[in-house]
């Protein structure tokens, strides 16, 4: 398995097993007081693109989960490869917005294709700092899925070592990017693969 195949398959796995289970608010920085809309998080490999560079099938770069390869090693005698993975999670939540509902209502005029409403014709907004709860719930969902599975996308989760998680810091201070909320998770996976024999070894066979 090549590194590209590994990263692609891991991204697809998290998209199916994590992203499709969660919904978070779509960032509307220019109209925070409006009705909130919910979408499944997007999944990205290595980098989160800027808003003007997202793929056509992605509504917004956040909410999202980004699968990053931090380090790898080939264990030549054991004929397997180990990858150290970091997941970067991000959500947006400026506070309470009326109209948030997990029951979608079709709306062709909306870029998401649906809207979420509680029937309030006059959306209101109350700023708060509870968005951290969304990112912690996102982290918990990923942790749960990693605990439930031993093999993901053909890779064995190295459960002999802990899954680590936390928040980002800058200059020893918690990274404050309100109304955006971020967190990370690290873990390792392994997979076996055929290792090409050197000419010296082939001559001995």
Describe the function of each predicted region.
Residues 188-198, 204-205:
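A hydrophobic membrane-anchoring alpha-helix module
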Residues 5, 62, 82, 133, ...:
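Short, well-structured alpha-helical interface segments that form or flank functional binding sites
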Residues 1-79, 200-205:
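Small/polar-rich, solvent-exposed N-terminal microdomains that initiate assembly or binding
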Residues 17-25, 149, 153, 194:
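Solvent-exposed amphipathic alpha-helical surface segments
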Residues 99:
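Glycine-rich, small/acidic residue-mixed loop/short-helix segments
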Residues 79-96, 104-124, 142, 177-193:
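Oligomerization/assembly interface segments of phage tail-like spikes and tubes
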Residues 126-192:
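Acidic-leaning, charged glycine-interspersed low-complexity segments
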């Amino acid at each position: 398995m090549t590194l590209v195949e590994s990263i692609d398959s891991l991204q697809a796995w998290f998209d199916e097993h994590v992203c499709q289970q969660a919904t978070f608010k779509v960032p509307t920085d220019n109209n925070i007081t409006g009705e909130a809309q919910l979408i499944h998080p997007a999944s990205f490999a290595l980098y989160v693109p800027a808003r003007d560079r997202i793929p056509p099938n992605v509504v917004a770069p956040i909410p999202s989960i980004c699968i990053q390869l931090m380090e790898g090693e080939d264990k030549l005698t054991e004929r397997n490869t180990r990858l150290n993975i970091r997941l970067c999670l991000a959500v947006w939540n400026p506070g309470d917005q009326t109209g948030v509902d997990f029951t979608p209502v079709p709306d062709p005029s909306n870029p998401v294709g649906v809207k979420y409403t509680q029937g309030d014709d006059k959306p209101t907004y109350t700023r708060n700092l509870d968005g951290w709860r969304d990112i912690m719930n996102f982290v918990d969902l990923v942790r749960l899925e990693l605990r439930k599975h031993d093999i993901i996308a053909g890779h064995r989760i190295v459960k002999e070592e802990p899954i680590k998680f936390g928040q980002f810091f800058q200059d020893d201070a918690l990274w404050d990017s309100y109304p955006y909320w971020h967190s990370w998770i690290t873990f390792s996976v392994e997979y076996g693969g055929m290792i090409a024999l050197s000419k010296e070894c082939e001559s001995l066979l």
